[in-house]
Amino acid sequence: MRYDPEKHHRRSLRLKGYDYSRPGAYFVTMCLQGREPFLEIPEVCHIVEDIWKALPQRFPTIELDEFIVMPDHIHFILHLHPDHTHRPTLSTIVGAYKSLTARAVLSHLRTRGDICGNQFWQERFYDHIICNETELFAIRSYIHKNPLNPGLL
């Protein structure tokens, strides 16, 4: 099948014209492929959390903030700090995180005998540029309350 830009074009979820390597705070949601609840498995949850905690070793210009694991998705807040020599974009950071976690989790699930295909995360992710402290506190509150109200997403 040939590529048809009219048929195969996916609308970008990123804000048009925005430089996602700019310093600032970002709220990100990533969902599992098919919304499968693999994150309910304690070992899988630990893998996802451990790789999250190690992310600043790979990207020294980031600061981790809130992070929550739900059965079929995760939320986190990430801060990008200014650095004139190394400015990864939000997509680069999220892509690396998705790749590292998918490889580790799929390997673990295969050793357990759980079949989940070759894709762990949905291809895209959702982001929100956090504009001020009030918004940051509101999103932190949302993340803290999400396990109490899993139907919020």
Go through the PLM ranges and name each one:
Residues 1-153:
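Short catalytic/metal-binding and nucleic-acid-binding patches
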